[in-house]
A protein has these predicted regions:
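N-terminal secretory signal peptides that target proteins for export/translocation
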Residues: 1-9
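Bacterial N-terminal signal peptides
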Residues: 12-27
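Formylglycine-dependent sulfatase
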Residues: 14, 29-450, 459-482, 486-496, ...
Length: 534
């Protein structure tokens, strides 16, 4: 076989594999004998991939994480797990199992914008509730302010200590944080901490200010442990979505954790706090005697926010929160279920928060719906990970889509070990002191061909190998094109919802308006001509 034939054969094989993986992500039901397990999703905020000891951080970086490290030793650790590039998209992806632009949850939900998770979106709570689960949400929601967007409007029976914003939003009106706030500009009106039950009006329990930030996770931990103890003996299984505020900027540790890290920084102390609270929740599960019937999954919403260093997590990857580079969305993930997940397991499967809804559905013995909450056809971007968890097989996913803000076409695509990067916004070399990172960087795309990285041998994305002499890999383009085609075609059948959070990023040019107006008039003319012909 000629060298060209070999390349062609290899390309066709990869394209075929992509086409198979990109088809409907229907979960294969997990074989979990006996009673349906309780399921607990633990999510921390902006925690760095390298903050945990099992990922190279922990004590070596001055902030030990013995409880999360133990969780990994007793369960399974994921190496190629992805969130999304920022908070709201990351949380929407975990709750819905859909690319954020499908739900319209593409960027950070800001105070005063209203709106939020659309009424029609199906959540993991909806799916598990239909399978007979009691459902409980506690902590950071960040999926909008509207009543129709609340957890109790999306499948959760009960919600406690609910926070609607990114943590730094609670500093906006604080005179110490913003002493130069002009009196002529009204201070933002933030909705405070909420609680409620499904079918009844929710209520604001208290307002939240800077002074409350250090102890928010204390309330989240307490509510979580109280719920576990109250429902441990139930015949009905429960699903809990527990969402900590640590380690989002500003990281202000609770008083009991001040100075407890070896590094003696607020961020380090907050890492110790997060780890301790996770450990206490796991201890509560053990003490309640339900560890063998409870799946616990820990992960993070997005990559570390390097823009706000030193008040940020650490990552060995290129880029930061808000970018399509690995640092924007590669996150730690650990699954724990004694007696079902073998201790010390590791996975290099490509997977992410998108896959949790299909995985939890499979574990619960149910499947994902074909219609949304409004009765319209829907699709999911979620792949069942239960074969990976239980050692019976691999995930059907072999690709990942990277999108920032309102990108419709992917800003980067990973297939197998190769990653093509098209969107270079906010990019900077690892460990540089470049200030224009993340959201602050200029929007820019590659001219003709993408950057190409081998993430297996170069996870830090140092070496673009697309057109280098010795490792030339331009033959991979049909592979990425196949994924791009599949994603774009899916929008025709399942159109994305209206974006829920919009703000001006500029520029809007007169020439753009004129081109759009000319196109609109041309389309109207064609429609009139078609009608006349009929």
């Amino acid at each position: 076989m000629s060298s060209w034939s070999m390349v062609k054969h290899r390309t066709l094989a990869l394209v075929s594999a992509v086409a198979t993986a990109c088809t409907a992500a229907t979960p294969v039901l997990a074989q979990t004998p006996g009673q349906k397990p309780n399921i607990i999703l633990l999510v921390s905020d902006d925690t760095g991939w390298g903050d945990l000891g099992v990922y190279g951080g922990g004590e070596g970086r001055g902030a030990p994480t013995p409880n999360l490290d133990r969780m990994a030793r007793e369960g399974m650790q994921f190496w190629d797990f992805y969130g999304q590039p920022s908070c709201t998209p990351g949380r929407a992806a975990m709750q819905t199992g859909r690319l954020p632009n499908r739900s319209g949850m593409t960027t950070v939900a800001a105070p005063g914008q209203g709106g939020g998770l659309p009424k029609g979106e199906v959540t993991v709570a909806d799916v598990l509730k239909s399978a007979g689960y009691s459902t409980f949400f506690v902590g950071k929601w960040h999926l909008g302010e509207a009543g129709y967007a609340m957890p109790t409007a999306h499948g959760y029976d009960q919600m406690k200590d609910v926070l609607l914003y990114h943590l730094n939003a609670y500093t906006y009106g604080d005179p110490q944080s913003n002493p130069d706030w002009p009196p002529s500009i009204p201070k933002p009106v933030l909705i405070g901490e909420l609680e409620g039950v499904a079918g009844q009006p929710y209520k604001e329990v208290r307002k939240i200010g800077v002074a409350d930030i250090p102890t928010l996770d204390d309330g989240i931990e307490t509510a979580s442990r109280t719920y576990i103890n109250a429902h441990a003996g139930d015949r009905t299984p429960f699903f809990m979505s527990i969402n900590f505020t640590k380690n989002h900027q500003p990281t202000l540790p609770a008083p009991e954790f001040a100075g407890k890290s070896q590094v003696k920084t607020k961020y380090g102390d907050s890492v110790v706090e997060l780890d301790t609270r996770v450990g206490r929740i796991l201890d509560t599960i053990r003490q309640a005697g339900i560890a063998n019937n409870t799946l616990v999954f820990y992960t993070v919403d997005n990559g570390a926010w390097q823009d706000v260093y030193p008040d940020s997590g650490w990552t060995p990857f290129r880029g930061t929160k808000g970018t399509d580079m690995e640092g924007g969305s590669r996150v730690p993930a650990i699954a724990w279920w004694p007696g079902h997940i073998s201790p010390g397991g590791t996975s290099w499967d490509i997977c992410g928060g998108l896959d949790l809804i299909a995985t939890f559905a499979a574990v619960a013995g149910t499947s994902l719906p074909t219609k949304d909450r409004e009765g319209k056809p829907t699709t999911f971007d979620s792949y069942d990970l239960s074969p990976v968890l239980f050692g019976t097989g691999k995930s059907k996913r072999n690709f990942w889509i990277y999108q920032t803000e309102d990108e419709l076409a992917p800003g980067a695509i990973r297939v197998g070990k190769f990653k093509a990067v098209f969107n270079l916004r906010g990019d900077y070399p690892p460990f540089s002191d470049e200030s224009h990172t993340g959201w602050r960087g200029p929007e820019r795309y590659v001219a003709t061909v993408p950057r190409l990285y081998d993430l297996q041998s170069d996870p830090g994305e140092h070496y673009d190998i697309f057109m280098t002499n010795w490792t030339e890999k331009s033959w991979t383009m049909p592979v990425f094109d196949a994924v791009m085609k599949q994603v774009l075609e899916s929008y025709e059948k399942f159109p994305p919802r209206e974006a829920q959070s919009l703000s001006y990023t500029g520029p809007i040019r007169l020439s753009q308006y004129q081109r759009l107006e000319a196109l609109r008039q041309r389309l109207q003319s064609l429609q009139r001509g078609s009608a006349a012909a009929d």
